Design a protein with these regions (language model features):
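Conserved class I S-adenosyl-L-methionine
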Residues: 1-32, 34-42
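Class I SAM-dependent methyltransferase SAM/SAH-binding core
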Residues: 44-88
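A short acidic, Gly/Pro-enriched loop at the edge of an enzyme's catalytic core
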Residues: 90-97
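A conserved beta-strand element that flanks and buttresses the S-adenosyl-L-methionine
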Residues: 99-101
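A short glycine-rich, Lys/Arg-flanked "PGG" loop and its adjoining helix->strand segment in the class I
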Residues: 115-127
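SAM-dependent methyltransferase
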Residues: 132-199
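C-terminal lobe and adjacent flexible extensions of AdoMet/dcAdoMet transferase-like proteins
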Residues: 193-231
Length: 231
């Protein structure tokens, strides 16, 4: 119950067609007809519709169970997958696009792992290739004064909340459902930190938006879709 992959599947809002279509449109445009590498491919929420758009997709994922669910879907057998840690795993060939969506960068729970992820991506990108990350802006401003817990969902069936350690940038997602409790660790990250990680990997910021429909990223944005380019 407590794995990141299980909770990913339970987050039904990310499967809304509008959200998926906007992200797929954004990625297909950046791919320019080349190959795409998805880090944390999971069950193919993005990879399958992107492949149907004519973009060859290869994925990396640590969860064999998630990949099995991808394989069971129409078109899933046509997508190559490497089983491994997407922060360090290497695959054959180069790509015009690599992407990491739905806050998955935060599943890497140390700064070292996130830096390694950027370097791994840079090693796979062709010159001019792009790396895309979709991630929420840390919600610290929503915390009540003096508190470190932020509720997300409260109902008779389920309670979901996050706790933050501002000294370490550690974050935990907490879920209580049907009498069971689970918790998942994350490491929250700011956009400026991601820009520095990209710089360390030899990439530079190309564009940053509030979402896939290219709304401007502003001080009140709750997420960002950022693109870094390999020279």
């Amino acid at each position: 119950m407590g794995s990141p992959s299980a909770r990913y599947e339970e987050s039904a809002e990310i499967f809304e067609p509008g959200a998926v279509n906007a992200t797929v449109d954004f990625l297909a445009e950046l791919a320019h007809g080349g190959r795409a590498l998805e880090l944390g491919i999971g069950t193919g929420r993005i990879a399958l519709p992107l492949a149907r758009r004519g973009v060859p997709v290869h994925g990396i994922d640590l969860s064999r169970a998630m990949v099995a669910r991808l394989r069971a879907k129409p078109g899933g057998d046509g997508i190559g997958v490497t089983i491994g840690d997407f922060a360090t795993a290497r695959v054959d060939g180069t790509f015009t696009l690599a992407y990491l969506v739905f806050n998955t960068i935060m599943n890497l729970t140390t700064q070292e792992a996130q830096v390694a992820c950027f370097r791994t991506v840079a090693a796979h990108l062709e010159p001019g290739g792009c790396f895309v990350i979709e991630v929420r802006v840390p919600e610290l401003r929503r915390l009540p004064l003096g508190q470190d817990v932020l509720p997300w969902h409260v109902s008779r069936e389920r309670i979901v909340f996050s706790s933050y350690d501002t000294a370490t940038q550690g974050m935990r997602g907490h879920h209580v459902e049907r009498g069971e409790y689970s918790t998942i660790p994350f490491w929250y990250v700011w956009s400026a930190e991601l820009d520095l990680m990209a710089q360390l990997a030899g990439m530079r910021l190309r564009e940053r938006w509030d979402g896939g429909t290219r709304e401007p990223f502003a001080s009140d944005s709750r997420q960002h879709l950022s693109v870094w380019e390999k020279p």
